């Protein structure tokens, strides 16, 4: 390869294991194979490999087989922290100890697994360009050349501008996404590559291309490549130089492919079935060892293998354990040769230790360029997520317009000064909530960042800093828009200096919050815990901003929080900037006032406002700031310096946390710890029945041996299937006598499709496809990106976008009842979407009860077949086991019409794949029609399929018929094709035949192929005019006529779907189980409520009966409502998991009605919200010293429980309406800020503009605040402090009582010294009800409000159902988003077919 010159691994490096006994560390375990404790069926990972001896030379590719392989790869990759081996064994790279080498040169060890994690909104071009930029410090033109050559080699040039996508956002196909992951790994430029099932999801031709490229790169760069592959053809195996075989605990062989076959077949006497490919043969040996079976069973019939000694004597040896095979290996000549080779290398003076100075640096580009490229990528990935970005922008614009108009032209009065303070506080609080909304998307980024940092594209803190740079830039734009609208609508001071100071402080305060909540996401293990931390931080920021509680009134034990709060410094600076030079008119708060006092000189009056002086009808802003709020204008620039200090500190902590604090990225590990915690707390999780005792690894429940099979497969219809004598044992030997599908529908139906076209935008993904499925097992094949998954989705009525044309017929009749059709089919998706906290049995059971006949005995049959212990949690399954569970979920429904499977064997080893296909074959023999996409099928696997439906890229059918006929068909039209029936795999042959014409020599497009092959055959056009196509049409018509003549309606054989109440009961029980086992979520919710209650209660400890106490009371209630925001975020994260499973899998299968999902989540969430809110009430209410009478406490508690119901239903409404979690978080911030603004706390009702007065009655917070405050302050006696008394001087000859009598009669309040003739001391309020009246509240409204609050809860319920319906049933949101994206064009092209 011309690009190999850019790759510089360690020269002539070799990886040597010399008798190594390897202990696996915790970092390496998790996704690998697990052994199970027979007593409790819980996972117990194997933790040691013994006496591993091999040497992989520079430039070699080694195929590693065996269950510990994945764990071994991870152990080597995490060598610094996980690798542990005991002497005298050793592991060396060149002549360096491997652990030392991995510490000094970690970037030389590259690991790639079967998981594909990418930023979904980046295009393929952006993704690859970023990787190249991080690893190669060369001119852009050369990087582009490398990119184009890599994309061309991997067949991705045609998707250059397409977004990558993921399981939930459509982009490139799954196979193409896998190739992107492989390219990234190539680019990592290491010396030792560990490829862990990296061909999962690739078709055989693409997998072969990958191995060819890998071989070229290995030879050219002299790198060492260890590869684990679950399924592979002999052509792929032949690409490897050596094979390493590992059992559970021991090495069984190392050598070339030919040596391996000779050793096991000739030396040990383990026969190889002629129809087995190499990897099937070797995997079967390993599987029999794992099942602790006798390897002799693989020979003719005896449990003993026949061996010849050196003297020619025939002996027998029985293998009872993997140790027996290990013992044979250790005494073999191959083992001695490896030991001699290793010994020779160790004494070879020419092989020197690796000098780190001779190795490329860990990061090939300087930090400055890392930051540049990461920042560019941060802009690209964020701007690509238009839904989230648009939601934030619209939220800011609407909020600024609404709040600006609410505070429209604030008067220059004392009351107006309160409004200015409220506006400042709201601005600060709004951007705090907006920063809080960024936490979900930060958690979603972490797996990608983890992967790329392990590939050493960049150092963690650089990526964090680049994200921070983008966030600051975007938030600055939002602050500018917000400030311009709000500032001038509210008529704050129209002076440039004042405006820019407002903008400056709000911007830098916002930056502080962005970094603070980013830090929270880095130190919290889960988003639930992050919301717990964020909730407490939010309360501290709001309460100790010195506005809710004035600085001088804070309790000494918490006053220090204010000085650690950036909001306090921003609040002081912004408000001081606004009020310092103002003169506030006091006409609205003069004491006394009214007609009686019109002629009284002002020297006898006073302004009832903090900072007022006797005899003045105004208050200077600076006096109000100093006396009322303890603010001073001279602190403005000091505060700016302090905020800068906070910002630097938060950034430094964030960078430190991202670099040195290892977050809990792995969701599976989190769930696994939840399950362990639950088991430690038995009162939270009662024992679920008896342990699974039926599981027996030595037996399968499956195909009965007595089942007769016969005949040929020449017809396209489902015909009796003949297993040849050589295959008969393979097909039946693994199964016992119990039938598995005695209740499967035996009546044959036919599903036919004619001229199916599917178009998304301007791109046609399926082009004029026709075919049919009756009974039988049909393979849907084609190269990656040909449209296989797309066709399955179209036929199964699962597509929700685009335009479908053509006909789909059931028994010759048009498909009309879509719901009945969905219930009659099963569909196994590529993505294994399950609820992690259910057990295997519970997952199967819910599918069986809701979609099947409820046959619980059949659950054990399927579970045993799939080798899945019933009581293990889904969270404890590795990826292979999750795939098996996905198949089981559909099998237990016993689909009566058709079973669709999308790559059911992807990621499974050869033996597991064969087991699954044999099971599918048995289903087909009993009348089940099965349509199945499959990648890389072996010869023995493909032999079980009756027919093949072959697609080429572009979604065009090129053949439909028996596999044997397919090979003849292609050879008859292309005399350059040669098929050897004895040795060639027919599946590989047909893929190669079509692929070579469509993408010759790895080219991406037909146009490129034609430039290399002028005579390329248009197989789709050839098929349309072929005799075989006419026979298909004829057979279709015959089967449709037979089905119509039978008069059997497939809907009559449907299992009776459970009633709505039964569905609700089942799903509610499932939700309860998942919630009960998610201890992180439950404890976080209780801790947040309890911690917030104590924090608020102690902050407002024993509120005094004075004026400040009145203000504290109303803000106490307001802060109690603020807790709802982080609690809603917790609820949404939890609800999202079940929503994703339902939308992506269960809804498409019509498992249960969509309203059941919403109701069940509400039924489980509400009691949890009520009980946790009870903890908040107990902690907060009684700490504040309010009226503790049973009546008051009881009514307050009752209303707070109703508030808990309100915020719970609000959170569910938003998460079930929003397209994703981050957008829902933005909606939460917007709605909270919107409703809280109109409740009368921030802006007195009397100052509401006429237009917005209706919103006071629309806001639910109005009624909650009024109810809570009224309960607290009703009949509450007020005793003003002397500093709160309004001074006044009575007229000559009058006492204070006489002078103030008329005023008090009209406005209330009391005189402290009514008999005095000098200076009067007037208190504004006598009882709390006076304050309530002034705030437009009344205790008499408590029960009226209670009813209105119920109405809001009811509205949330209605909105939740309506929102879900419009978004996911009627799909209004995608249409709206489509309009938005037309206004804001997307850089990526349309998605391609899968």
Swiss-Prot record:
Location relative to the cell: Membrane
Gene Ontology biological process terms in this record: sterol import
Topology term for the membrane: Multi-pass membrane protein
Alphabetically ordered keywords of this record: ATP-binding, Membrane, Nucleotide-binding, Repeat, Transmembrane, Transmembrane helix, Transport
A Pfam family the protein falls into: ABC2_membrane_7
SMART domains given in the database record: AAA
Cytoplasmic side: 1-420, 659-1080, 1369-1394
Transmembrane segments annotated in the record for this chain: 421-443, 468-490, 497-519, 529-551, 558-575, 636-658, 1081-1103, 1107-1129, 1156-1178, 1193-1215, 1224-1246, 1346-1368
GO MF, one annotated term: ABC-type sterol transporter activity
Source superkingdom: Eukaryota
Residue span(s) of domain ABC transporter: 33-273, 751-978
Binding sites annotated in the UniProt record for ATP: 782-789
InterPro entries: AAA+_ATPase, ABC2_TM, ABC_transporter-like_ATP-bd, ABC_transporter-like_CS, ABCG_dom, ABCG_PDR_1, ABCG_PDR_2, P-loop_NTPase
Cellular component per GO, a single term: cell periphery
Entry similarity comment: Belongs to the ABC transporter superfamily. ABCG family. PDR (TC 3.A.1.205) subfamily.
Functional note: Transporter involved in the uptake of sterol.
Record-given protein name: ATP-dependent permease AUS1
Organism of origin: Saccharomyces cerevisiae (strain ATCC 204508 / S288c)
Taxonomic path: Eukaryota, Fungi, Dikarya, Ascomycota, Saccharomycotina
